[in-house]
Each structure stands twice: as C-alpha cells, then as structure tokens.
C-alpha cells in the first residue's frame, strides 16, 4: 500500500461517502473505500486500477461527471497542475471538504498553502513521511478553463516556425528543453514508413517529424493524459494530423515501425525513474521492422550504449552537447 493511501485510511471515517480520488496510486485504496471513484491521468495506473476495479476509474484531463461528497487530490509534481486540479475539484465541492495528501519531500506543505484560497486549511495527519490536509470549500471558484492555462509559444526551427501548445504538468512546460533541442537538429535521413514519437510531451518532436516526412504515418505516445492533449493541440495549431495515443511504455506502441524517435521520460511522479527508457531500449526491436531505426536523446552520464547494443544493434553517437547525447541504432 502506498504510504499516502495509508495516511488516508488512518482517517477512513472521513471517506465513507461518495469520494473522488484524484491522481491516486494503483494500490488497494479503491478496494478499501467502497463509495470511492477514481480519476487518473496516468495511463499505466489507470489500466491497473481498471483491471481490479472495473468501471470505477476515469481517465483524462477532466474529472468524471457526478455528485461527490468530497474529493482527495494526491499531490502531483507540477505546481501549475496542482493549481488546476485543486480549482477543478473545489469548483465541484461548494460547502464540502476537499483534501490534499502528499509526501513531505514532494512539497506538500508548500502545496497546502494553495488551499487557502478556498477556505481555512488545516493539517489532519502526518505519518509515513506524508501529510493530509483539509479545507472546507467556502469560496468555490469557477471551473478553470484548460485553454486559458495552456502556454502557447513559437519555435523557430529549420523547417519553419512551429506553434507549440503546452498544458500544465507536461514535461518542460512552456519551453524547449535542451535534450529535445539537440534531437531536433538530428532528424534527417529517417527511413520512410510508420514513425513513433515515444514520450511525446507537448508534441514538438512529433509535429516536426510530420512536417519533415509528410508521407509517413506518425504515431505519438505518452503515458500522461495532459501530454496527449497537448500533443493533439500542437498538431492542430500547425494544421497537422497524426494518431496520438495514451499508453504505458513501449508495450502500448504499434509494431512494424520504421523508426522510433524519443526523448524518453525519466520521472515517475516526484521520483526519478529510468524504467520507461530502459524498457524502451530493451523492447524496441519488437516494435521495429527489419532495418528499422531507434534514435534517442539521453543524458551523457547514462550508460545506454551497452544496453542498446545488447538489445538492438551497433550504437552510434550522432552528437553531444549540453550534457546530452544522440544515440542511433538499427535493427538487424
């Protein structure tokens, strides 16, 4: 059981009614709270919850419809996403309690201050390096408009200006990160066919690929619902069309790909995790056609070349800058 869930269950009498659990971990909490409904924006956690508690978990950038007696937000990493989620939940709970739970090292005490705009916040419990906060929603806000929270910016790229739409919680929100900037300079001479942007974020790499290779079929994949929505908006802003899907890791990707392009993710919530990128390398060959190519950017200190050569083929370093390297390998 996740320690945040354990803290909630210490106060289980507060959550006996119709409770919405937002951003909950994929543990047994839903099984302990019979009246609870889950809202997740992480495709992997949603899939696990749906297998165990079918019909009780909603996925997306907006909460499920219905009336709730209370809601609990499991603190996400992004402060801007936290603000959007708290406002979204508080708008549905006038005169009712809203709870916030999170790890101390994840910034729960700072985030709890955001509850003050809805009423008087108080700390209910502290255990397992986590805290549980409550606020009675006396000043319910209007439901926030996700469009108004999006950041729009233009990148001047070799193929021309690219309009980017970035939503709260998406990696490198509102800016181009150094790794992707380097990879954008090394997208030439990709094989024709079906291309995958793995861990698509705001869709910058995917949109660039579609402009450069308009005859290729493009798939963008991310585990996060806000990233999926951002990519769709970025494509639309540039008059481009592609398939954008939510899925947990490379196993959710189609087969017979001509190329996989990625600035692979390295966070799971507030924690650093290289599981998704390592699994991508280990299983890329299963998703590539013969002579298909993988091209990724990664921190230079990560020992990916031996892993790439073990599972895919000869690893070439195409470029190095700002602490990042571009690796290329072709399936034999």
UniProtKB/Swiss-Prot annotation:
It comes from Stutzerimonas stutzeri (strain A1501). Gene3D superfamilies: Vaccinia Virus protein VP39 (3.40.50.150). The gene is rsmC. Keywords: Cytoplasm, Methyltransferase, rRNA processing, S-adenosyl-L-methionine, Transferase. InterPro entries: DNA_methylase_N6_adenine_CS, Mtase_sm_N, rRNA_ssu_MeTfrase_C, RsmC/RlmG, SAM-dependent_MTases_sf, Small_mtfrase_dom. This is Ribosomal RNA small subunit methyltransferase C. GO terms for molecular function: 16S rRNA (guanine(1207)-N(2))-methyltransferase activity; nucleic acid binding. It is found in: Cytoplasm. Disulfide bonds: none annotated. It catalyses: guanosine(1207) in 16S rRNA + S-adenosyl-L-methionine = N(2)-methylguanosine(1207) in 16S rRNA + S-adenosyl-L-homocysteine + H(+). Its EC number is 2.1.1.172. Monomer. Specifically methylates the guanine in position 1207 of 16S rRNA in the 30S particle. It comes from the Bacteria. GO terms for cellular component: cytoplasm. Belongs to the methyltransferase superfamily. RsmC family.
């Amino acid at each position: 059981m996740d320690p945040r869930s354990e803290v909630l269950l210490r106060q289980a009498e507060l959550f006996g009614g119709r409770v919405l659990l937002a951003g909950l971990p994929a543990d047994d909490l839903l099984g302990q709270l019979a009246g609870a409904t889950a809202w997740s924006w992480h495709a992997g956690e949603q899939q696990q919850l749906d297998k165990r508690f079918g019909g009780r978990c909603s996925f997306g950038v907006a909460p499920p419809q219905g009336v709730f007696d209370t809601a609990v937000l499991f603190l996400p990493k992004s402060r801007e996403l936290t603000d959007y989620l708290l406002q979204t939940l508080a708008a549905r709970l006038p005169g009712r309690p809203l709870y916030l739970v999170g790890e101390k090292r994840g910034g729960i005490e700072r985030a709890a201050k955001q509850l003050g705009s809805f009423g008087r916040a108080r700390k209910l419990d502290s255990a397992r390096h986590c805290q549980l906060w409550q606020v009675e929603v006396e000043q319910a806000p209007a439901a926030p408009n996700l469009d108004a929270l999006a950041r729009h910016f233009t990148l001047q790229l070799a193929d021309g200006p690219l309009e980017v739409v970035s939503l709260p919680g998406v990696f490198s929100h509102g800016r181009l990160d150094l790794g992707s900037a380097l990879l954008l300079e090394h997208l030439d001479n990709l094989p024709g066919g079906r291309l995958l942007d793995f861990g698509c974020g705001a869709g910058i790499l995917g949109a660039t690929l579609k402009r450069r290779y308009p005859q290729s079929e493009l798939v963008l994949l991310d585990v996060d619902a806000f990233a999926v929505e951002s990519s769709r908006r970025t494509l639309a802003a540039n008059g481009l069309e592609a398939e954008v899907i939510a899925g947990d890791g490379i196993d959710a990707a189609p087969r017979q790909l001509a190329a996989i392009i990625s600035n692979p993710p390295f966070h799971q919530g507030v924690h650093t995790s290289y599981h998704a990128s390592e699994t991508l390398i280990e299983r890329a060959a299963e998703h590539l056609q013969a002579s298909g190519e993988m091209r990724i950017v990664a921190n230079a200190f990560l020992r990916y070349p031996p892993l790439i050569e073990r599972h895919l083929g000869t690893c070439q370093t195409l470029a190095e800058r700002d602490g990042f390297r571009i690796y290329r390998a072709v399936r034999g």
